[in-house]
């Protein structure tokens, strides 16, 4: 979610999507929800009330300082797992879906072109799966891999293929065209895209980014774009027997991009 525009779209549309598509579990990445920079506790609670089961984040998680406080007490708020040991909050959790399934959600951040000093995301993923394996403690496993490099995201997907239900990338704000089920049954998409105004620069008002490209001199702050938002994401049908993906498709609803709703749920 990016800014007020993205929040409004999610809060208005998500309850209907849950009802119409019979969604058992919903994950929303909210790291840009507060004006494009971080998330407040109020926004977190509003997102949960709208129907999200878990909120994931990324490199902007601490942009709103209050997140350092409420992350300690909100079980359904995740920051990247591979932050240094002792960091406030947590990076993974086991949750109950509406159908009774036990869903492990983990938030991991990439290092390529981002934060090379973070703990290794592949070692982190292995640690998470060893502690809560698919088919044993968890009926489904979802990774939000928050990263810049598509190569790092897809390699992580291959690394956990057959051991996770879904690996979905976040961070670039642009939905990719590679939604697929990998060889051993893990659904994958390099980036889910954003819930925000696509008449923008990644959800931010386009004038200041454009000015900086042209003049190299900042004139003001980046501010979230305020036009009508498009909801972007991925929908996955997971086997009750194996915990692996049976179907996966992109989800886009809104005025700017071509709309698509998974045919297997329409």
Task: Describe these PLM feature segments.
Residues 1-266:
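Acidic, metal/ion-coordinating pockets
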């Amino acid at each position: 979610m990016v800014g007020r525009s993205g929040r409004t779209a999610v809060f208005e549309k998500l309850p209907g999507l849950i009802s119409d598509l019979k969604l058992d579990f919903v994950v929303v990445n909210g790291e840009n929800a507060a004006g494009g920079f971080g998330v407040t506790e109020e926004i977190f609670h509003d997102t949960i009330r709208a129907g999200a089961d878990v909120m994931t984040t990324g490199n902007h998680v601490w942009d709103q300082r209050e997140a350092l406080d409420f992350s300690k007490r909100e079980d359904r708020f995740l920051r990247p797992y591979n932050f240094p040991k002792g960091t406030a909050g947590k990076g993974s959790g086991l949750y109950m879906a509406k159908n009774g399934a036990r869903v492990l959600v983990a938030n991991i951040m990439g290092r390529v072109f981002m934060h090379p000093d973070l703990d290794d995301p592949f070692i982190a993923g292995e640690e998470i799966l060893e502690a809560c394996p698919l088919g044993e403690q968890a009926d489904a496993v979802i990774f939000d891999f928050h990263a810049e490099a598509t190569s790092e995201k897809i390699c992580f997907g291959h690394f956990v293929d057959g051991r996770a239900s879904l690996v979905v990338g976040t961070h670039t704000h642009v939905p990719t065209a590679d939604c697929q089920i990998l060889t051993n049954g893990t659904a994958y998409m390099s980036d889910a895209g954003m819930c925000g105004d696509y008449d923008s620069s990644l959800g931010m008002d386009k004038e200041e980014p454009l000015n900086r490209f042209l003049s190299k001199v900042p004139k003001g702050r980046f501010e979230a774009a305020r036009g009508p938002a498009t909801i972007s994401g991925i929908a996955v049908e997971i086997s009750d027997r194996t915990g692996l993906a049976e179907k996966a498709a992109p989800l886009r609803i809104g005025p700017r991009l071509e709309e698509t709703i998974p045919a297997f749920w329409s």
